[in-house]
């Protein structure tokens, strides 16, 4: 049975359909969310995948790009096997439509190219040598992908990810995943310290694999006090995800958590996070998307050079 909350959220989504419709590159852009971390092994990819599915279950048109700088395996985590990936798009041997997979709950999944992601046009000005270069063509395809979705999620795993640290600003929201481990918290602080200043990006902290809301709140407050004191930065708390054995089981079985164990504590927490992101993120329908904005910045810089 569909809950009253889900019905209400679907109504909210209908109001936000102006975010992005049509196939041209001039329409309203998708809400862009990068899920990142200061270190590996904190569950970033699993969270990005299941967050996309949670949005899909709310009838949100969601696309997930595996932009991990490591070995991208988002497709394998949801039982797919994409032979073609972003690396082939960047090389010009495949179109973005060719490599995009139909994922669970109506989401679209773009398999990653690993370290090749660092060559995406918005991160590599050399990709813009000529108007007909692979960089120009790739970014036009990415802009079209944005225009055809309401929410664009990026698994931005990997320290210093260019989507997160671009000096011109990146996605609308950056969700920084951390765990209670001291090394994870230290890496989260280092990530915040390295973020570009004065950009219109909302930074949110998500505490993963934690035993309770109280513990998550304590960890967040500790991190917040440090960033306030030394960085004059105040990230908000996105929420917390409990330590749940179902997460590892789902990964081993190559089935997303929200499909295999939708009523598990971690799955419910991710669904609630998706709901909050929709409620709490007003969008300017005239604002350009992340790819369109950074593409324009880089091309203008080249024209002025």
Predicted regions and their residues:
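Short gly/ser/thr-rich secondary-structure transition/capping motifs
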Residues: 15-17, 90-93, 134-136, 153-158
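Flexible glycine-/small-residue-rich
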Residues: 37, 66, 111-114, 156, ...
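Short, hinge-like loop/turn segments at secondary-structure boundaries
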Residues: 79-84, 194-195, 221-224, 257
């Amino acid at each position: 049975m569909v809950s009253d909350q889900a019905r209400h959220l679907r109504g909210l989504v209908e109001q936000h359909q102006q975010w992005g419709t049509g196939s041209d590159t001039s329409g309203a852009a998708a809400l862009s969310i990068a899920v990142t971390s200061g270190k590996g092994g904190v569950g970033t990819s699993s969270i990005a995948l299941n967050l996309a599915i949670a949005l899909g279950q709310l009838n949100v048109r969601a696309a997930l790009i595996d932009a991990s700088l490591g070995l991208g395996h988002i497709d394998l985590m949801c039982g797919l096997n994409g032979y073609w990936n972003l690396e082939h798009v960047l090389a010009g041997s495949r179109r973005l439509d060719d490599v995009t997979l139909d994922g669970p709950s109506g989401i679209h999944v773009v398999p990653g190219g690993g370290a090749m992601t660092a060559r995406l046009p918005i991160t590599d000005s050399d990709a813009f040598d000529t108007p007909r270069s692979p960089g120009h063509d790739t970014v036009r395809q990415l802009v079209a992908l944005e225009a055809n979705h309401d929410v664009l999620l990026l698994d931005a795993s990997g320290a210093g990810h260019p989507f997160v640290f671009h000096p011109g600003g990146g996605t609308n929201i950056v969700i920084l995943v951390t765990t209670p481990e001291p090394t994870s918290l230290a890496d989260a602080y280092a990530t915040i310290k390295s973020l570009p200043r004065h950009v219109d990006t909302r930074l949110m902290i998500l505490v993963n694999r934690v035993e309770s809301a109280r513990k998550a709140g304590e960890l967040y407050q500790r991190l917040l006090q440090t960033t306030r004191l030394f960085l004059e930065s105040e990230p908000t708390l996105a929420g917390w995800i409990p330590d749940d054995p179902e997460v590892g089981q789902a990964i081993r079985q190559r089935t997303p958590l929200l499909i295999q164990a939708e009523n598990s504590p971690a799955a419910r927490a991710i669904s609630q996070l998706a709901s909050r992101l929709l409620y709490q993120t007003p969008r300017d329908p005239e604002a350009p998307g992340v790819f369109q904005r950074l593409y324009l910045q880089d091309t203008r810089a080249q024209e002025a050079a």
